Amino acid sequence: MNKEKSLLIDYVDPFIGTTNFGTTNPGAVCPNGMMSVVPFNVMGSADNTYDKDARWWSTPYEHTNCFFTGYSHVNLSGVGCPELGSLLLMPTTGELNVDYKEYGSKYKDEQASPGYYSNYLTKYNIKTEVSATPRTGIARFTFPKGESHILLNLGEGLTNESGAMLRRVSDSEICLLYTSDAADDMQCVD
């Protein structure tokens, strides 16, 4: 009889600690990596139990929430302080709308494993998938036919950034300058 081999990674559940003030998130992250790509579901809807603007909140994700406003990049997991959680990337379809309270979507079919996260945005019929490498994050959005958009929200995030600028360096590189209420200096992300 052949037994399937189990790998240690098969026992990892990224959803542990994502509710009840555990402050962890199920996002895609590479061990010792610079980038973490995390579902951001803590702003923009009265349907959410926990909203970062209604109370002090220290994580970009809460498992019991149901309203998704994008993937944040550069996150801390499990630390309990409301820092980073910025650079929100959100796929949409239909007419362009840039108000996160209106463009956000409920989601279903959430899946997470080490280095991978996906969900299905019910408002737009979009499957979203993200992964991470030691230096970057990658996203794949499966759109239905018709008009579609990928929004980059530089003005909202876990810490409510107070300023940002995006500069296209080349076809494959952008430079982002942003500042948050907690930092006085501008930072560049390539």
Regions found by a protein language model. Give the residues of each.
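Single conserved hydrophobic/aromatic residue that forms the stacking wall/gate
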Residues: 178-190
